[in-house]
């Protein structure tokens, strides 16, 4: 099925693919974290009404620019402000935590909101070395299991939803991540490599290729092929950066300001950061080893709504996709809200062009 987005303003329900949103709860210059989190609440309510399929919260540590270090806490709050939309993590940075505790958290959420909870996990640290050391202070790095081992343990806890047999309550296998929900959280592995794709397939999880972090078309092609081959033909999801504006020129201007950097210190795994300043801070905090950092290619889907939908549909057809997770890489509230409303098809609002003075009222209107 193909469509011509220029012929009409199709609702999200009429598209040949599903759209979800990734929210990093960005703190715009001059505002507080409380204001950024209030906007996340408003945007979730808006996404629920507009027909977006999922709303995911990202995890970031020790940064004044992003307001959410604990997706599971914000998820619980957002559930109380929505009715239909699935809400989840995009994702929990599993290297920092006990898989058992993560399973407990998301089993509790799934018990509170059956059929509405997503659990996405990722390999990244979600912060710079100082926060990583603080989060992992109770672990001996030499004895810390690898990511695949942690993910497999988490999977076991999520899959075990029956009570242990009578008389075995004190056995190691009797451990349960209570409460045991009737419908478990839907698990996703977020990654940008063939290795991650194969791990997701091995676990029986959905795989999300993080094109908002890794824009390499070759890596995308290989990961999609690997996941489809190892999972029995399942389609992955694609997380993609998207900016929608009233004109292609306006969207291109917003997209041109975005940048990413890849940084590595010594033999430690490379990480991706959002600015040169973050790359330099990472090098300072990591200490030891020869530092390297370089710009990463960014590929943002941008333009008018019709242009963006056509490009997403082309990606859908090329890779056999069914769903996208949209990252709007804008901190400023005005263009970010306008981009999401345009994407949802609210053309009259976008034509009005909200002014900076209207941002607070706009956020309140989103919640209604």
Residue ranges and their predicted role:
Residues 1-85, 366-367:
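N-terminal beta1-alpha1-beta2 module of alpha/beta enzyme domains
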Residues 2-13, 140-176, 218-319, 351-354, ...:
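An alpha-helical appendage that flanks or caps ligand/catalytic pockets
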Residues 11-14, 48-49, 75-83, 110-117, ...:
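Acidic (Asp/Glu)-rich catalytic clusters
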Residues 14-33, 95-162:
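Flexible, glycine-rich active-site loops centered on histidine and acidic residues
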Residues 19, 47, 51, 59, ...:
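Conserved, mostly hydrophobic/aromatic
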Residues 19-23, 55-57, 87-90, 117-121, ...:
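Hydrophobic faces of well-ordered beta-strands that scaffold small-molecule active sites
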Residues 23-38, 92-100, 181-191, 296-305:
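Active-site mouth loops of central-metabolism enzymes
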Residues 195-213:
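A conserved active-site cap/scaffold subdomain adjacent to cofactor or substrate pockets
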